UniProtKB/Swiss-Prot annotation:
Its cofactor is dipyrromethane. The modification S-(dipyrrolylmethanemethyl)cysteine is found at residue 241. Pathway: Porphyrin-containing compound metabolism; protoporphyrin-IX biosynthesis; coproporphyrinogen-III from 5-aminolevulinate: step 2/4. This is Porphobilinogen deaminase. One of its GO terms (molecular function) is hydroxymethylbilane synthase activity. CDD domains: PBP2_EcHMBS_like. Monomer. Keywords: Porphyrin biosynthesis, Transferase. Its EC number is 2.5.1.61. The lineage of its organism: Bacteria, Bacillati, Bacillota, Bacilli, Bacillales. GO terms for cellular component: cytoplasm.
Length: 309
């Protein structure tokens, strides 16, 4: 019986996601056993700086990918939105389980909705994507950066001077907390989700054919196709956490993919948005990027990167 070593970050959410996925594999009843190896990433250690200032995408995966390449672990369970657009040579996303709710969750201290927040209220987020879109809708709000895991951010909302914070609905759902803490879900038209938000990425070595065959049992074809379109878009624009960039795809009738893609200025004064429909994920992602580039997306990305140096 093969033992599969599964790499995971140490946070409660990461371990919850990892153990959930292992349970899906165990339910297949195949001759494998599993062991979780906890790994600390750079993003877990640097908590006093915004994500955009410490290197963006890859902050929560690089150390885990190193463990995969050196064969300390056999596979890893990541949040798809933490994954860089390009993986290291030798690694692949072996499986994308069915995506859960991709929306952002708005949580206010006193139960007000986003539109009813007082003028000048303080909104906590560590995401340029969220801050740009929400400032576009409510330029009067003050954005204050907030870092830490879900528990830490909820505690900061209660104890510090934040009036509201934004978290991913998916994480709260996986922890079983969505019913008790979320004030409202932000509609995708108000706040386009991050590329891959709500989805998991199961990463492994591309030459591990035995494991790839096992992972194929849990793969969700719709999630795989829609997330692929989002990630092609992200790659073409070379976007990471340093840029207000969003991409969310759904599957429509007749198997068409509809991708809503967005790039914004840091302060939300400019939001460029395109909706592209097509069958091939790669073509949809590339077309969305090309259309936004024609609108001036590259200039916004350069300006955002410069602003943070």
């Amino acid at each position: 019986m093969r033992k599969i070593i599964v790499g995971s970050r140490k946070s409660k959410l990461a371990l919850t996601q990892t153990n959930w996925f292992i349970d899906q594999l165990k339910a297949l009843g195949l001759p494998y056993e599993f062991e979780v190896k906890e790994i600390v990433t750079k993003g877990d250690v640097i908590l006093d700086v915004t994500l955009s200032k410490v290197g963006g995408k890859g902050l929560f995966v690089k150390e885990i990918e190193h463990a995969l390449l050196t064969k300390e672990i056999d596979m890893a369970v990541h949040s798809m939105k933490d994954m860089p657009a390009v993986l290291p040579d030798g690694l692949t996303i072996g499986c994308t389980p069915k995506r859960v709710d991709p929306r952002d969750a708005f949580i206010s201290k006193n139960g007000e909705s986003f539109k009813d927040l007082a003028e000048g209220a303080i909104l906590g987020t560590s995401s340029l994507r969220r801050s740009a879109q929400l400032l576009a809708a409510r330029p009067d709000l003050q954005v204050k950066w907030i870092r830490g895991n879900i528990d830490t951010r909820l505690r900061k909302l209660k104890d510090e001077d934040y009036d509201a914070i934004i978290l991913a609905t998916a994480g709260l759902q996986r922890m079983g907390w969505d019913g008790e803490v979320i004030t409202e879900h932000l509609d995708e038209t108000l706040c386009v989700p991050a590329v891959g938000q709500g989805a998991l990425a199961i990463e492994c070595r591309e030459d591990d054919t035995d494991l790839l065959q096992l992972l194929a049992h849990i793969n969700d074809a719709v999630t795989e196709r829609t997330v692929a379109a989002e990630r092609v878009f992200l790659h073409k624009l070379e976007g990471g956490c340093q840029v207000p960039i969003a991409g969310y795809a759904t599957l429509k009738e007749n198997d068409a993919i509809e991708l809503t893609a967005l790039v914004g200025s840091m302060d939300g004064s400019v939001l460029l948005k395109e909706i592209v429909v097509g069958i091939d994920p790669k073509q949809v992602g590339l077309e969305a990027a090309d259309r936004l580039i024609k609108q001036g997306a590259k200039e916004l990305i350069l300006a955002a990167n410069k602003e943070q140096q």
